[in-house]
A protein has these predicted regions:
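Accessory carbohydrate-recognition regions in carbohydrate-active enzymes
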Residues: 1-327, 333-401, 408-419, 427-446, ...
Length: 519
């Protein structure tokens, strides 16, 4: 990147092929007021940046400004220092792709309010998610010389409100002095304007009226506490830095969506990406936080009727494959995490494993396992079932392998609950579930071709596709090749090796293809 259009104030999801939502952007400009992103884009160099978990700074040479930022969970401070006496403009955009944003300048209380309605992607793409990202930005009016709102290039000086139109925003113009820093505080909420302001007050003023440097130090202390849950020593400092960089990045997802002082709730579980390593890591290093995440999943089941597979922006998505909220819940429970409602969690896990929504609209919206009836009836998902009500269609073999693992995980949950249950009839139900799910956890055998020893597509009549291409993507495999997915039997690697050991030796062509495999 060589051009900077502004600073996005958000809770960026970090990976998972998902877009940000409910955000707003703030741009700091020198001298000339330029409203639209393309107009205000200003050159910058990464050599002029400083970036830490608790602090960011960049020199905007053509604007004759130095911009610095620090942030806590719901609030931030933007600090701008002019190099010379000049006008300093602050441009604020609610980033509504649908042209449904709102912005208001409250000149009495010296606050800019706004919201950006959230819309779904994947299942129900473009539909309202039923909430907005709200923000407040507090400013010091002593050096304010102009303000207004705009739509596109249409400026309304001294205007106070703009809404439900594309490319809207507001600007504040201040008289800047060389070397004198200017600060703006912002607060966010996914609930309301009032909660955004309350979050700002709670995280700033309740800590003694934080200025930029005190907030920065407070944020640094929080990050040090988070990152030092694991202490690493190595003679190569670059490897230590790499480790802590990875730990820092994995700390963003899932993210907390509740307001300060409310019961903690998390959302945006990019589940297919995080159930293997990140969520199990949390059970080890931040067990209390892990339990809060698990209770958030339970809350989604209680409020919406189904345990989600890949919940984002307060919605079901059916993105990617598998039923890995069940795997995450089971993993947490068997590792001793107890600050979530395990029995209620099991209700949702069991429902996903054995049933599908009666109302087709609910299935379309992403509730329930995809193609669960095919999986139950056949012991695998046949190639004839194209799994059309999903963002990823087909991928039948990968789904079968992952459902088999999920069944194993739910079985472990059933066993753990059975062991602690005193009611004889309920113990019997857990035992029956365990027996069936353990049986189903061996369904991986139904998609590993016993002749070739590789994962393969299979028809409803039991015949194999007999795929010979091991290294290129196939429609029955998810984001990989058969040479990758064949090994996805973490619940029974010994059984997999036994099947492979008894398969037909590879011919020269297959061996050559295998030798070329690069993960």
């Amino acid at each position: 990147d060589s051009l900077l259009q502004g600073f996005r104030c958000s809770h960026w999801i970090v990976g998972g092929c998902m877009q940000d939502y409910g955000s707003f952007t703030v741009a700091a400009l020198g001298d000339e007021l330029r409203l639209q992103p393309g107009q205000r884009a200003t050159p910058f160099s990464h050599a002029d940046e400083v970036s830490h978990p608790h602090y960011y700074a960049v020199n905007l040479k053509e604007e004759h400004l130095k911009a610095e930022m620090t942030a806590l969970s719901h609030t931030s401070i933007l600090r701008v220092t002019p190099e010379k006496d000049q006008l300093v403009h602050l441009v604020i955009n609610p980033n509504s792709d649908e042209g449904q944003g709102y912005i208001e300048i409250d000149t009495l209380n010296h606050v800019v309010y706004g919201y950006n309605p959230v819309h779904r992607i994947y299942q129900g793409w473009g539909e309202s998610a039923g909430f907005s990202g709200h923000f407040v930005l507090a400013y010091d009016a002593r050096d304010l010389v102009d303000y207004g709102v705009f739509e596109g290039d249409n400026r309304i000086s001294k205007g106070l409100k703009m809404q439900d139109k594309p490319r809207i925003g507001a600007w504040l113009t201040f008289r800047g002095k060389a070397g004198k820093a200017m600060e703006w505080m912002s607060g966010t909420s996914f609930t309301s304007r009032e909660k955004a302001l309350a979050n700002l007050n709670a995280e700033n003023y309740n800590y003694g009226g934080l200025d930029f440097y005190s907030m920065m130090q407070f944020a640094a202390d929080l990050w040090c506490e988070r990152l030092h849950t694991i202490d690493v020593e190595h003679r190569d400092q670059a490897k230590v830095n790499q480790f802590y960089g990875a730990l820092y990045r994995c700390s963003f997802l899932p993210h907390e969506v509740s307001d300060v002082g409310d019961e903690i709730r998390y959302d945006d579980f990019s589940m297919w990406d995080i159930y293997r390593a990140e969520l199990p890591l949390y059970t080890l290093i931040t067990p209390k936080r892990s339990g809060e995440m698990m209770q958030s999943l339970v809350g989604m089941y209680q409020n919406r009727g189904w345990l989600p597979a890949f919940p984002c922006w307060n919605s079901y998505t059916a993105a990617m494959i598998g039923d890995h909220a069940s795997a995450a819940l089971a993993d947490a429970y068997v590792k001793g995490i107890r600050n979530f409602d395990a029995r209620k969690a099991y209700e949702g896990m069991r429902m996903n494993a054995f049933s599908t929504p009666y109302i087709y609209k609910e299935y379309q919206e992403g509730k329930g396992r995809r193609a669960i009836q095919s999986y139950i009836n056949n012991g695998y998902i046949p190639l004839e079932d194209m799994v059309e009500e999903a963002y990823h269609t087909n991928e039948q073999t990968s789904r079968t392998l992952e459902y088999a693992y999920d069944d194993f995980a739910v079985a472990q949950m059933a066993k753990a609950l059975m062991d602690s249950c005193r009611d004889a009839s309920q113990r019997q139900k857990y035992q029956e579930d365990y027996n069936e799910l353990i049986r189903r956890s061996e369904n991986w055998r139904n998609v590993i071709n016993p002749v070739s020893g590789w994962a393969d597509g299979r028809y409803e009549n039991g015949k194999w596709l007999n795929n010979k291409d091991l290294v290129h993507r196939q429609s029955f495999i998810t984001e990989g090749a058969t040479c990758h997915y064949t090994w996805y039997v973490p619940q029974n690697p010994e059984g997999l090796f036994d099947v492979i050991r008894h398969s037909k030796p590879m011919d020269k062509k297959e061996k050559k293809a295998e030798d070329k495999v690069i993960y």
